[in-house]
Amino acid sequence: MMNKILLFLAIGFATGMLSCSQQTLEKTDSLPQTYTISQERLLDKIKGGWAGQTIGVAYGGPTEFRYRSAMIQDYVPISYADGCIKNYFKHAPGLFDDIYMDLTFVEVFDRLGIDAPVDSFAHAFAHADYGLWHANQAARYNILNGIMPPASGHWLNNPHADDIDYQIEADFAGLMTPGMPNTASEISDKIGHIMNYGDGWYGGVYIGAMYSLAFISDDINIVVQEALKTIPENS
């Protein structure tokens, strides 16, 4: 399944890059107006994005909820033995809605195309057999009870609308829009409001934009600062 997804993304991205030069990025001294990338490097970055997310969620698993409102200091050991990713996914698969939700959305794109209606994404995860929490779970409940997006993610119907759910699963939006942060934001506008609104949604828009910009810049500071332009200054 993952090989199929990566192949779909590679083809879609390669096609998208043909029009990447037509999308105007906000003029700065840091980003090019047009950018060319080889198919080999494009695929390498796509694979790196998925691998990085998978490694990250496994690495962060043992520390979740243990350092609230604080940075994890360098002297704190975090165990990351060989085979730990496999063990996490085998023995605690329910931890990784970050990954499952991403792949669910990509599967819908693969099956129905880039213009797939938002209801298709909503039904796909609402009827999936993996567990969910907070805004995702509330959105699932809403959808199964007839409250469809964007109302399913609105704070009037979803008490977790400001949570980080879409932020942890917005990676796909940037991975599917290389060098096109505005297009990543359009995808987030459609899918992110299934479960979030307000700051809960802005976080996902920002993450998607950073992924998108990482295709055309290897400077972390540039990626971080440019992606901020996709969300309100005071969000």
Predicted regions and their residues:
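N-terminal secretory signal peptides that target proteins for export/translocation
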Residues: 1-2
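C-terminal motif of bacterial Sec signal peptides marking the signal peptidase cleavage site
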Residues: 16-19
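Structured, active/binding-site neighborhoods that engage oxygen-rich ligands
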Residues: 22-235
